Amino acid sequence: FPQGIMAQLARTAAAGQPGILSHVGLGTFIDPRVSGGKLNEVSQEDLIRVMNVDGKEWLYYPVVPLDVCLIRATTADTEGYASMEEEITYIDVLQLAQAVHNNGGTVILQVKRLVKAGTLHPKSVKIPGFLVDAIVVEEKQEQLYNGSDRFFSGDYIADDSAVTMLPLDQRKVVARRALMEVRPGYVGNVGVGIADGIGNVAREEGVQDAFTLTVETGPVGGATAQGIFFGATVNARAVMDMPAQFDFYDG
């Protein structure tokens, strides 16, 4: 299933709904009239269906019941209420926890530290404790394979002196050409690959404030991280839940 559909399906499953009707995937390899997302001939069952509602075609994606989820936050109190202050994004951890809990499954939460019950600021809590079945404390919890990055988590702001000039190669030329298509006031989605350099080139040119770049994982604004760190953003203006981010894209 497409990334956004999977994120939205977690929310749909949590609500006890059967599936999602979406225009996403029509006419692509996800469309059952093409290949239905099947990788090879071993997969025979059509999981996705074409449906007509009021004369318009939609793809129907059924909910896949979830039994277990392993999610990560930064701090949890002894009753399982958890905050995510050192995480890069919230992605769909809340929706997954709700979906698994409401399906009678097991929600396992990994955190860096444990604090006394009721001491977390309520607006910082992203996962309510009644959804959590088990807590694992890992004090050396690393955000990335090379350790946490407080710029990615939004604790630090990078000024212009921190901007690294990208080498003038094919990737930069393509990113610069793509930047030329962006108009003031645009809101864009930056995908993985060469597109991850657009934000950096915009900062080099001093035009980063003329438009807003977003990433599927939730960041809004700022400059996207590149390569294996893609999905993170430096100087993000906001961080959305991933299902909400895709709601905006799809609409």
Placement of each model-derived feature along the sequence:
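Conserved alpha/beta enzyme-core scaffold
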Residues: F1-G251
